[in-house]
From Swiss-Prot:
It comes from Corynebacterium glutamicum (strain ATCC 13032 / DSM 20300 / JCM 1318 / BCRC 11384 / CCUG 27702 / LMG 3730 / NBRC 12168 / NCIMB 10025 / NRRL B-2784 / 534). Keywords: Amino-acid biosynthesis, Cytoplasm, Isomerase, Lysine biosynthesis. Its main location: cytoplasm. This is Diaminopimelate epimerase. GO terms for biological process: lysine biosynthetic process via diaminopimelate.
Amino acid sequence: MNLTIPFAKGHATENDFIIIPDEDARLDLTPEMVVTLCDRRAGIGADGILRVVKAADVEGSTVDPSLWFMDYRNADGSLAEMCGNGVRLFAHWLYSRGLVDNTSFDIGTRAGVRHVDILQADQHSAQVRVDMGIPDVTGLSTCDINGQVFAGLGVDMGNPHLACVVPGLSASALADMELRAPTFDQEFFPHGVNVEIVTELEDDAVSMRVWERGVGETRSCGTGTVAAACAALADAGLGEGTVKVCVPGGEVEVQIFDDGSTLTGPSAIIALGEVQI
């Protein structure tokens, strides 16, 4: 039986998502539905889906049941713990549609609560700052891409990352690099990993490309930009700082502190409609 449901399409530094409002938790969103909707030829097309639901209606949620919960799904249908770009768009949706009253509020995720501040917003665009928590450095590891081995820093942002700062790599050379699915240490990353290839820190900025677990290469990855900033600062012998992270989809600002991190960047809601699934 076909269901007709409302949706919105949006992106945060061109990491694009389908927003599915499900405030009454009536939709049984299956992996097959997610794959179909995210298909860029046969569906709407997106890097993932953000289902808008209360935490009380999410199985296994450990956050305050009254919070709005970002039920995030990767394009392959798998559940995901956290998405920094997705949180910005999710917060933009909640605020612009009147589902929250304040510009500062909490959002539930599978990685726990994330606090957000709406710095500017209208129905179409926003600038949002997200409290990303303390980056958990898990150690050093490597990956192989196209036969080239990259050494990197394991960083857990609620989801696993391997941020590889490459000595001497320029932004133009990074842009020209052929990025394919990496092979990695599955004992170190038993649940898979998001891999970032990062230039060295220069003038408080880095460039980054990312291969996301369950998706492939994306134009941006919010948690990945925090992992990249953390790795670039460590590579430069620094424990904290503010880093501009340039991704194919735009720019974000990451701040790393002793006791946490923030991610600030844009969000855009570009379409509203209905879809049959």
